[in-house]
């Protein structure tokens, strides 16, 4: 089994997930359920014997809080953590902070669906998934992947769309395929990589 370990975790449920709001770069914390999800992720990783050498996180509170709870469960609170805006959620621009139902009333269901689920169409003032990939992928290639290939066991805690961008590259998925991929909050996805950075194995640690 490969020692080139990469674990991806979407943050626990956020306050705005619960309220059905577009969040993007807005900065709500996680809910009580989100706290439970993060702690559960940490317990599952600990039960499987995971110990990490490197940790990466976005600049947003919901991801940072999730990672801190995971590391607490692992007894690794002293592990250095690198945070970067490159791992932030997709910026929803003018949709940020709006209730998703209200947005559908304002712009129409079809238009909002296009903004949410097309690869290269951005909402007003915001990013498409393609835009998100354009900032997330270089950071992965330059900052995260080299350590993984050296055998550093690495955890990345981020967001639905920034993680979709990484998964698209890791699993060599088409834009159509990645847009259909739903990522549960607080569920670790375990990748073991080959020396050429392709995926040897993948496991969802749902418990």
From Swiss-Prot:
SUPFAM superfamilies: Phosphoglycerate mutase-like
GO biological processes: gluconeogenesis; glycolytic process
Species this protein is from: Afipia carboxidovorans (strain ATCC 49405 / DSM 1227 / KCTC 32145 / OM5) (Oligotropha carboxidovorans)
Function statement: Catalyzes the interconversion of 2-phosphoglycerate and 3-phosphoglycerate.
Annotated EC: 5.4.2.11
Binding site for substrate: 10-17, 23-24, 62, 89-92, 100, 116-117, 160-161
Pfam annotation, one family: His_Phos_1
Record keyword Isomerase present: yes
Residues annotated as site: Transition state stabilizer: 159
Reactions performed catalytically: (2R)-2-phosphoglycerate = (2R)-3-phosphoglycerate
Family affiliation: Belongs to the phosphoglycerate mutase family. BPG-dependent PGAM subfamily.
Protein name: 2,3-bisphosphoglycerate-dependent phosphoglycerate mutase
Keyword terms: Gluconeogenesis, Glycolysis, Isomerase
Active site, renumbered: 11, 89
Lineage, highest ranks first: Bacteria, Pseudomonadati, Pseudomonadota, Alphaproteobacteria, Hyphomicrobiales
Pathway(s) this gene product operates in, as recorded in its UniProt entry: Carbohydrate degradation; glycolysis; pyruvate from D-glyceraldehyde 3-phosphate: step 3/5
Subunit details: Homodimer.
GO molecular function, one term: phosphoglycerate mutase activity
Gene3D superfamilies membership: Phosphoglycerate mutase-like
Keyword Cell inner membrane in record: no
PROSITE patterns: PG_MUTASE
Gene: gpmA
